Amino acid sequence: MIDLDIFRENTEYYLPNLQCLGKVSICKRSKYMSLLLERLEIKHPIFLAPMAGVSTPELAAEVSNQGGLGSLGLGANTAETARSQILKTQALTEQPFQVNFFCHQSIELDPTIAQTWIDFLRPHFEQYDAEPPTQLHCIYPSFLDNDDFLNVVLETRPKAVSFHFGVPHPHQIQALKDAGILTMVSATNLAEARAIEAAGIDFIIAQGIEAGGHRGIFNEHFDSALRTVDLVQLLTQHCQCPIIAAGGIMNGTQAQQMLSLGASAVQLGTAFVQCKTSNANDAYRHALFHEHITQISASISGRPARGLLGHWHTQIDLPNRPAVAAYPYCYDLGKQLHAAATKQGDQGFGAFWAGTNVSQIRAMEAPDLINQLLVEMQQVSY
């Protein structure tokens, strides 16, 4: 019989093997895990990945109530809807959770590139008896653009806030620190991780190439494409703050491997998309269990993102494909094409984000999945 109560309250159960990790030993990493659990006030080193469009207050609360760190992906929200989502989550749980925003560099849309991209996709609109838009809009604001999102976070005071695509402005980081709100930023290579540390961020999320959804790369034109296992080892050896492993983690065995390499926690997204409390539609849920090939494409949104193989990969990402419009303008067009296709019963242009190990997905609700992960993690520990 596995005593989950003992397992949940003892960090050493997660890091049983003492081994050298180069510059930073596993002993020191064990202390980092203890620090992370203590500062976040959570029982387990298991995070729900913040997934814009899929995250819900209900799913976040379920994970947090089970001792992990729930999350809200708010990058696609306005300040008002972000506030509403946070308040709703706080009404469902008294436990800590994180909120996530995008920190991309906003750039001016190149009209020539945009028009070329619209024209390239025009035949695909026409096959669904639709016309593409004449203009593209910036549908996802950046946290860097103004302090509207910052003010919402300062008002609602979630336990932690994480960022994708870059680092917030210094004054924003300082305001969060002054409010006692912990900060996390995704890194895909050592240079990004060092920039994150230099900015005074509390935790680094090591996003491996296996991860579903958007790559957290700061520069959309450069990707080191490191596997999660390699990235975790690299960052734990060279960084002096807790590392959260993300990408391709679907079960407790994989989670425990990351912890044994020095990660202080693991973050899972794809594994939770199938939960009833996620916002995934029926087509997305069906695809998760039946379409197990994933591929990275920038055609959907304008930035590289990994998803289940669909029309974007087989019909759009061709050798003659022109340059895509800038993110998130490109995503405006992509969503409209998906909407047109859906009206005709075709879900092939959906952005069904998923990691490389999606074939290992299990039909489980969040509380049961957390418990199953813990059981599997302990079994590896002995």
Describe each PLM feature range.
Residues 31-238:
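Active-site entrance/lid segments in N-terminal catalytic domains of soluble metabolic enzymes
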Residues 13-14, 19:
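Low-complexity, intrinsically disordered or signal/transmembrane-proximal segments
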